[in-house]
Regions:
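ATP-dependent adenylate-handling active sites, centered on carboxylate activation for C-N bond formation
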Residues: 4-11, 34-37, 81-83, 102, ...
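Short clusters of hydrophobic/aromatic residues that line enzyme substrate/ligand-binding pockets
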Residues: 30, 55-56, 87, 111, ...
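Residue-level signal for inorganic ion chemistry
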Residues: 24, 67, 96, 174, ...
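Phosphate-interacting basic helix/loop segments used at nucleotide- and nucleic-acid interfaces
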Residues: 103-111
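Acidic loop->beta-strand submotif enriched in PP2C/PPM serine/threonine phosphatases
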Residues: 45-64, 114-118, 160-167, 175, ...
Length: 310
């Protein structure tokens, strides 16, 4: 969460910031940049040690990021080769400030990542925010009564602080009071020529690489297995790539647990360490209000997918 001015005290900021402490139960921190406040709730995935805690700082600049930077080993190596940067953690997000020092806002188009970030530039004493091209990671913004910009991972952080909460546009960054587009998923690339077999092989290769880069984690990786095509493919690929038992989970409601059977078949086929969770219908219905409040959405598909996880 970020407040791009000193319009509130740290204690006031914390009151709104703590509405989403469940997003990061491992640690929490608020930094006063001198020109505003940055807050971060940590869910440790990469660089599990305290050195991986955000905000990261470099020469008076700070960054908070909810994201996964898939290309970070290559970028980190390139940055270290310049002789200008050293790193204190194994966190993928620690490369962001050095990347900004090297490339400015052009850094965003260089990232193979899903992310939402807020960056304070200590040299210009100004803020930048950005979101990945697809909008995988959530980010919201709004202006307070004085025209100050605020950002947060969830809309509920901003309720009571801004007059209107808006979703941050994917593929954009905000700088100098304006939004700038750095990526447009709607832009079609060149037409791929080839036979049907060649095109299918290309799809297969990309799918496998997409799963492989998401397996990099310092924390244990689990897989939600619904028994449908998508999750079954992902779990089968992961099991083959890791060469060991992966841990899969399936959630269903009592009286309508047909998906659990399909998930069980897949788990047996790939040899995973499988866990089933059956939720009584009454408990699922009773949880609806809490689920909607937690996810901050009335979207039917999102709510339906979230009840079992909750």
């Amino acid at each position: 969460m970020g407040f791009c001015d000193r319009g509130v005290t740290v204690s006031e900021f914390k009151r709104f910031f703590d509405r989403t402490i469940s997003r990061g139960p491992d640690d929490s921190r608020i930094i006063d940049t001198g020109k505003g406040l940055l807050g971060f709730h940590r869910l440790a995935i990469m660089g599990l040690h305290p050195e991986g805690m955000q905000p990261f700082e470099l020469d008076g600049s700070y960054v908070v990021c909810n994201g996964e930077i898939y290309c970070f080993p290559r970028l980190k190596k390139k940055l270290m080769e310049t002789g200008k940067y050293t790193f204190v953690s194994e966190s993928d997000c620690e490369i962001l400030l050095p990347m900004y020092k090297e490339y400015g806002t052009d850094m965003f188009r260089r990232l193979d990542a899903e992310f939402a970030l807020i960056l304070y530039d200590g040299d210009t004493q100004s803020y930048i925010a950005a979101r990945d091209p697809i909008g995988i990671r959530p980010l919201f913004y709004g202006y307070d009564m004085h025209g100050t910009m605020l950002f947060a991972s969830e809309a509920k952080n901003l309720v009571g602080l801004v007059w209107r909460v808006r979703p941050f546009p994917p593929g954009c960054y905000w700088k100098g009071g304006q939004f700038h587009r750095y990526a447009d998923p709607g832009e079609a690339g060149p037409v791929i020529r080839g036979t049907e077999d060649e095109i299918c092989a290309g799809i297969r290769e990309r799918l496998i690489k997409g799963v492989e880069k998401r397996l990099v984690s310092d924390a244990k990786v689990g897989f939600l297995l619904s028994g449908g095509l998508d999750s079954s493919l992902v779990c089968a690929i992961a099991a083959r790539l890791t060469g060991k038992k992966i841990r899969t989970f399936a959630i269903g409601m009592s009286g309508d647990a047909i998906d659990l059977g399909y998930a069980r078949e897949v788990a047996e086929f790939i040899g995973s360490d499988h866990m089933e969770v059956v939720v009584p219908v009454k408990e699922a219905v009773a949880a609806l209000s809490d689920v909607i409040a937690t996810i901050g959405s009335y979207d039917i598909t999102t709510v339906r997918a979230s009840v079992g996880m909750y």
